[in-house]
Amino acid sequence: MFCKLFYENLIIIPALNKRKTLLNIDEVRKNIILKEGLYYFDYTASGLAYKPIEDEILKFLKTYANTHSDSSSSAVLTQKCYENARAELKSLLGLDDSFYLIATGQGATAAIKKFQEIMGIYISPATRALIGEANLRKLNLPLAIIGPYEHHSVEVSLREGLCDIKRIELDENNEIDYVMLENTLKQNAKRNIIASFSAASNVTGVKTDYKKIYSLIKKYNGILALDVATLSAYENVDCRYFDALFLSPHKLLGGVGSCGLLAIKKELCKNLPTFAAGGTVKYVSRTSHVFTNKVENLEEGGTPPIIQLIRANLAYKLRNEIGLNKIKEAECELGEMFCKELEKIDEVINYCPENLDRLPIFAFNVKGISPYDFAASLSSEFGIQTRAGCDCAGPYGHDLLNLKDNAIFEAKPGWVRVSIHYMHTKEDIKYLINAIKSCIKKHKKR
């Protein structure tokens, strides 16, 4: 199922759409940067570059300078552009004044690490060895509760962090087992609970009822973080129903090369940086130092990701100027079309549940053919870019493929993932379906 500035006469963060009306998808499509002959169906891994955004970045670079200085006009302008981008992003994402927005690293993984640093969960292997496992076991560790669809960046990092971890499994309907979740919360009611759930699977596109999860987590005074790396390319989440958000703007159209983003409730942050560096201090003498009281700057030590944040802002602005409703409508139509045609192919094993609200992301295998060989054939013979593997969601993959933990495999298990995007056309979908059928026939003859 699909869908149940002007500053001193200079434009700081310009609107991509001067007419103040929703952009036409056909016109947007013409400005995607993609080599002729390639068909891109890998948007869940990364978006593509967009020429008007690259043009705006080139304009901005004419007065570029590092931040953290009030003595030169270029530095002042760059600082204003940077902070303006942050402010606009908060608005584009629907964040209210109870949140900080921190730019970090290259994607959601960096946001996850920053969140764990702020919450005291992240610990380096060297620090762990220095403290010793025996001493660590004496600590009153928090319980981290995760969902069944989590990316390795969430699950593996928590396994290695200063916390105990509990994975909520799938129920008989292939969605989150809410009974198991509430029982886990009841059994650990006196503990410090930090929950992290993916808002949408990057494998099957299945959406999470994050409002329901939030209500359960808050019933037991827990904290809820949402991984929206997959979802936020298409829609926002209501800021009343989470405490932290992990975002990956590079997955948006035009977001290539942008930074990761962490939205986090102000009440969760301290007045000390997780890493003390240049840009986090107001004054440093030979014997002492004073940190800035601006928390967002505290967590962006050193040169901040200036171009990356501005690019992220432009990508989200493009998303909103296309229109979230228009995006949803296009993806519903194209997703339904692909799903119906895929189901007609007898050799295809489709792992995406039919009864759940989800994004048009498909994971499938072809009987008797390696997903890696199949994806390579689509690419080499038809120019179709998909992705084969487990999509950094191994535990969920074990559920989908009915695999036993720690089993020995002749080849790495996986599937072919296809991401249907609102920039695709019906002709693109037909081309993809015909290519899948053709590849199946060719492999059968071998």
Q: Which residues does each PLM region occupy?
A:
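Pyridoxal 5′-phosphate
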Residues: 6, 12-446
